[in-house]
Amino acid sequence: MQNHLTLSQLQKLVKATLDEAFALPVWVSAEIAEIKINYSGHCYLELVEKGGDNGVPLSQARAVIWRTAYARIAGYFEAETGQRLAAGIRILARVMISYHELYGFSLNILDIDPTFTLGDMERQRQITIERLQREGVWDINRENPLPQVVQRIAIVSSRQAAGYQDFCKELGKSPYAFSLTLFDAFMQGAGAEDSIVAALDAVADRMDDFDAVVLIRGGGSASDLNCFNAYRLCAHIAQFPLPILTGIGHDKDTSVADMVAHTALKTPTAVAGWLVERMTGVEGWLDTAAL
């Protein structure tokens, strides 16, 4: 019989080798693919490095932030970046490597450097800007003619969003009869970009029914705004056949979506106010012309 190791012996050798080679923490960059907080307060993550063939990651690993460290790490990260730890965000984490005979390889996250994520977000934002400008689509939506009377409005937002409710309430205070059609979409989170693009495509299928599109979100923190700097969504907005008005609801930075839209305002309420003022102006002009 050949000399052999039992499975547990092999696993223990692997563990001992890793423990010796990585006795101290190391810094690792990766993208968060999944993140969840369990009932005990521990944070479990799936980390990936993209770049493999056919959309398959080059590398993938499980990670954990124990409850005792999670509040500190997550709180500091959000305070510095304006973003919650979420799927789709790239991070630089200080980790201890762990190997268990039953549960395999994992990373224990001890700290996260928010400056890395800030730099990566800004880098991706600049890449989007430069690509849209290079492709010659940067000004297309602004060149769409906006009717004097903007009355038939397609709204891309979430039905549950406070910003959507604020927008409708503000228009409801006016004496004008706006026709509003909601195209429901996720406005934050990992699926937001795909959901908003799908909603815009649905509007495009009925473009003759509308004068303009209003893209609004509001309420909560400034987290989950990355999709409004993403190339695919911003390219859709830039080349959309109807003028798009944005009220994304953040004050610190102007998103690329704002930059390529026909008209950008800070909040959903501000968009509603702008539309009402435009109607008031048209009404005043008609009254003057009738004299």
Describe the residue ranges of each PLM region.
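Short glycine/threonine-rich loop/turn motifs
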Residues: 150, 154-291
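Acidic, two-metal ion nucleic-acid-processing modules in DNA metabolism proteins
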Residues: 1-215
